[in-house]
Amino acid sequence: MSGRRRRLTESVSTRVGSYHVADAVALQREGAAMVVGIDILLTWNGSLPFSLGDLRFLHCVRSERRSCGKSLPGMNSSRVNMAETSGISAFTQFWGCIRLDGSCEVTRRPAMDLHGHHYREAYLQPAIMDGPCTGASSSARGRDGKKALIHRLLAALCPVRCPAKISGSSVRPMLAASRISGPVRSFIASCRRQDEQMNGRSQMRDCARRAFLPLRVSDARSEWICFIVAIW
């Protein structure tokens, strides 16, 4: 990690209790916008181990190209390098875009480990609702908490870079944890068992232990806000 990226990481990372809440790393300029990595830890039962208010420190990095663009780039090898600076191990990743009119588009991308190796297609399941982004709950627990987390992540960015019309209630992406497939649940369970055998605790140190949400930030004049969501 370069000195500049390390300084940024140190300046915006925070801890709440014993949980590492987020570690935002400014990555290389690639395509239309600067990519900002945000590493969020959630507990296994789906509850949030921190207050959503603790996400207020999130920062946008100004894009030089002033547009997120309307195409969804692939997960190439250079972008996978962000895994090495964030501690990600293996997650299913989804590119998604949210338009100002509230509609959503989602494209599945291969899940990768920190070396860029692909996991089975069976792990790739839609986790974001297509169509209108409505009905996000303000609850901070369980499935609704995950919807609210994505909602608040976008809302936290808006005062910095987004048009005023994108408010906390106007664009609400949905994260449907209930749609996570059986193979994914089995994968999670096997990781937990493996970790419990090694450590006597379910800490998931070596297998899918944290969620990584790198946000591709659009300019205020762009029609799009693009983001990636990683779900276990």
Curated annotation (Swiss-Prot):
Which cofactors are reported in the record for this sequence?
Answer: FAD
Q: What induces it?
A: Expression is up-regulated in the presence of large amounts of glucose and during nitrogen starvation, conditions highly conducive to elsinochrome accumulation.
Q: What EC designation does it have?
A: 1.1.-.-
Q: Keywords for this entry?
A: FAD, Flavoprotein, Oxidoreductase
What terms describe the molecular function in GO for this protein? oxidoreductase activity
**What pairs make up the disulfide bonds?**
none
Superkingdom, taxonomy of origin: Eukaryota
Q: According to its UniProt record, which protein family does this protein belong to? A: Belongs to the MQO family.
Question: What does this gene product do?
Answer: Oxidoreductase; part of the gene cluster that mediates the biosynthesis of elsinochromes, pigments consisting of at least four interconvertible tautomers (A, B, C and D) that have a core phenolic quinone to which various side chains are attached and which play an important role in fungal pathogenesis. The non-reducing polyketide synthase PKS1 was proposed to iteratively catalyze decarboxylation between acetyl-CoA and malonyl-CoA subunits for polyketide chain elongation.
Please identify the protein, giving its name as recorded: Oxidoreductase 1
